[in-house]
Amino acid sequence: MSNRPEERLDRRDFMIASIATAGASAALAVAAGTANAQSAATTSADPASGTVYTGDIVQGKRVASALDVNDLEPGKKHFLYFRGVQMPTGQHWYVSVTVAKGVKPGKRVVLVSGVHGDEMSSVHTVQTVMNQLDPGEMSGTVMAVTDVSSPALEGMQRRWPNSGRGVDLIDINREWPGNENGATAASRHAGLLFNRLLRPNADFAIDFHTGTTGFDVTAFNLASMDVPEIKAMVELYPVGQIFANHAYPGVLHNAFVDVGIPAFTPEIGAARVLNLEMISLFVEGTMNVLKHHGILAGPLGRTGKDVGVFIGNSALPILATQGGLVEHLVKLNDKVEAGQKVAIQRNSFGEVVAEYTSSLAGEVTGQRSDAMSEPGNPLAFILFHKATPDGGETYPE
């Protein structure tokens, strides 16, 4: 029995969990958020300037509700908390901020992780970069924000738990640049961070991610490669794939790009685990980027020129049509040909109920890691190059 459920996807929709449920939630959020459009324009028109401390001390670290890295002492590392949105109890979610302020002036970079709560390798990558920095030898500033979605990280789950409508989960990486007067806590949290912490302190930015629970991805960078400043940075990473795509509105790196700040998204393997080998590649690439911008001195490490980089601008999802156990016939990074069988599925009797093939040639960039699947779940994504990319599509989580 042959099933070829293929639907071309030209945006970063690697992490589908429940299309119907998430789509309904997104529609509700959009409808509710429309009422706040006028207030959103006033709160996000100009990024905040100047550092504001709340007077609180948490675990020995000062708490800020706005940050300007120019106010910090040069030649030091600074550790503080940024005050995010309130919880239902009235307390605030705090976000960890580390700033390495060089002794000499220079460019400012923002490194972000923890936008999704199950993406551990992204956090470790940023921590490793920051641990290697010596402010006494730097020109410029590197600011790391490692746990953007604190409530999601507490449960090591992808989405932000929202209690406003009973039980709901919100993907904050569809909310940027956020709205300080938005319809959900996640939207307000994003607005506070973007307006008062991230945007005011960035000349360029990197938002680190991984695959999601139940769906693994390989090492790649998602970037708008037609932007010269972004292309120059992405090519400094010794990783094997580049997804040259603008993605869609609502993701953090696009919010940066929309206000003139070059940004992109590295993807670092599987969720919930630390892939130290893969992390080292992205640390090396990020250090190359800091050298490229003159923040650090010294020779570059390995770059994309030292590895065989496959560049695609579209991803083909292969979706399950049956429920059952999934057996993959290819691995991440494998090259596939048009018509090649990539997976089969068995029911509870062990009978093969579906076979899945790729309709085009490319490389495997993502695979379902959960052994069982219901109809509609993505089983694999094939990265490929489309001669004429489509534009303007958006896809629910």
Mark where each language-model region is:
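Structured catalytic-domain cores with a bias toward divalent-metal coordination
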Residues: N3, E7-A22, Q38-E397
